[in-house]
Regions:
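Transmembrane alpha-helix/helix-exit interface in multi-pass inner-membrane proteins
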Residues: 347-364
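Alpha-helical bilayer-embedded segments of polytopic membrane proteins, i.e.
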Residues: 168-215, 242-246, 293, 300-350, ...
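Conserved oxyanion/phosphate-binding beta-strand-loop segments in alpha/beta enzyme cores
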Residues: 150-159, 164, 182, 186-190, ...
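Short coil/turn segments at secondary-structure boundaries
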Residues: 138-139, 170-176, 254-256, 270-274
């Protein structure tokens, strides 16, 4: 059962609140638009011909009604008690349609705040999608969630914002970038001066491996728009780091990584724990029958836009320019494979150590703090651990505050630990070499399978093989979503 609520406009014509007519709305014969048939907008006109104070009549909904709209063809979500119908807009979402679908029928207030940098810009997209709000008697989050825990976490975020914990230190990221470029330049200078013998090749392979891993870690920060004040700058620099310097698709990475963040260790919503194409393992993963579909619809050309292809191709071009004169075409290809082979275990360990040993479950619709803490663990801090993991040893803090610069994680960790202790949540912090260990004897095998899956998925030859042989992984870049990125 729904009732109606009226939002009035201020005298300057600006709406007080977030509602505007839905762009795809239908109109009644009297000229009043109806947002999906569930709300009305009426505008009074004064005698002088000017519009008077417009009013928007919005429906009020119960959680029981909202939770029914959790399908791909019918997606509602709640942000700050406002109800939005994102069904028709999901495919235009810059973060990918699946991110919205994963929260259909749920409260998305905290994940919305966590994943976006400039809320004023993002809210412009929300206004046309507004269809109502929660009824006054309804809590601000689902009834099974602890309102005190949710409010305490939001108070923590406000405290961190007041402490400038989301402020970037440009020197830190400049030094990180300089490290990458110096290592790559040094590798070229060594080959140029000493030749391309085996000892030199092995040595520069290790230099390039370090450069590639650190490049991956920096692009990860850029992907979370935690480096530059404008998301457009971060996206452009991420393309340079991920595609030009590493030869990987940023669209593919973001498409999967954003899903991992919003539904960490939730099967099958988190693509990072889906080993189905290679292994069927774990307690929650049913036996899946899948077929190899060799057809044009699954060829690589279908997945990459020309822009993505150009960016990724530039990686191979610059490698051939740098090392081709010393190794030739075939030798340069082998060098690339060697570096990728050495890099993959390092990156796999960093990305898997904090999640694979933790709780993996089906959808439980937990609050943001509980969901991230139960699915994530930290690794003890040291100068080496910070460098080796790109500060992802503070994975709990990173998942709670993705847009926070990584150099501030260690500062906020004590506050997060204190909040977890207050609400009885286990804050797990392990030594680096024991980070993949877990209580259950089954987890080492699971961790091994996840790591092998990640390795195969990130070796160079797999970029072609997975598109042809593993269509179930859905690695399509969401280029159509990025085309509607906000220009800032």
């Amino acid at each position: 059962m729904t009732t109606k609520l009226e939002d009035k406009h201020a005298g300057n014509g600006d709406l007080v609140g977030e509602g505007q007519p839905y762009l795809g709305e239908k109109y009644q014969t009297n000229g009043k638009p109806v947002a999906n048939g569930r709300g009305e907008i009426s505008v009074k006109q004064e005698a002088n011909g000017k519009c008077g104070v417009p009013r928007k009549s919005l429906n009020m909904y119960s959680w029981q009604e909202i939770q029914k709209h959790n399908q791909k063809a019918d997606q509602w979500l709640v942000i700050n008690r406002k109800v939005y119908d994102v069904t028709g807009w999901a495919n235009k979402h810059p973060g990918g349609s699946r991110v919205l679908n994963h929260y259909a029928g749920e409260d998305a207030t905290d994940v919305f705040r966590a994943m976006h940098l400039d809320l004023d810009i993002v809210k412009l997209y929300l206004k046309p999608l507004l269809i109502g709000e929660l009824a006054p008697e309804e809590p601000s989050q689902e009834r099974h969630k602890s309102s005190q825990l949710v409010e305490d976490f939001r108070e923590l975020r406000r405290t961190l914002e007041a402490m400038n914990m989301f402020k970037v230190n440009p020197v830190f990221f400049f030094l990180h970038f300089a490290q990458i470029m110096i290592l790559e330049t040094l590798a070229w200078l060594i080959v140029w001066h000493f030749g391309s013998g085996w000892p030199v090749t092995i040595f520069i392979s290790f230099l390039l491996t370090i450069s590639q891993v650190q490049c991956f870690l920096l692009q990860h920060d850029l992907g979370h728009i935690s480096v530059f004040p404008k998301s457009k700058w971060s996206r452009l620099m991420q393309k340079f780091m991920m595609s030009h310097l590493k030869g990987l698709s940023t669209c593919w990475w973001n498409h999967r990584h954003f899903q991992h963040h919003v539904k960490t260790n939730i099967y099958p919503k988190d693509p990072d724990i889906n080993t189905g194409p290679l292994f069927v393992n774990g307690y929650l993963k049913p036996v899946q029958v899948w077929e190899m579909k060799l057809c044009p619809g699954h060829l690589t050309v279908n997945y990459f836009s020309l822009q993505e292809f150009a960016w990724v191709s530039s990686f191979y071009i610059h490698y051939f320019i740098m090392f081709g004169p010393f190794y030739g075409i075939f030798g340069t290809i082998l060098l690339i494979f060697l570096v990728k082979f050495l890099e993959s275990p390092w990156v796999a360990y960093v990305t898997q150590m904090s999640h694979v040993p933790m709780r993996i479950s089906k959808e439980e619709n937990r609050d943001w703090l509980s969901a991230q803490v139960l699915a994530t663990c930290n690794v003890e801090q040291s100068f080496f651990n910070d460098w080796f993991t790109g500060h992802l040893n503070f994975q709990i803090e990173h998942h709670l505050f993705p847009t926070m610069p990584c150099h501030n994680y260690h500062k906020v960790a004590p506050l997060v630990r204190s909040l977890c202790a207050k609400h009885g949540l286990q804050y797990v912090n392990k030594p680096l070499l024991k980070s993949l260990s877990a209580r259950s004897s089954h987890f080492p095998l699971t961790a091994c399978l996840h790591t092998i899956h990640w390795l195969v998925n990130h070796l160079p030859i797999s970029y072609l093989l997975r598109d042809i042989c593993m269509p179930s992984m859905d690695v399509r870049p969401f280029r159509e979503h990025q085309q509607c990125n906000v220009k800032k």
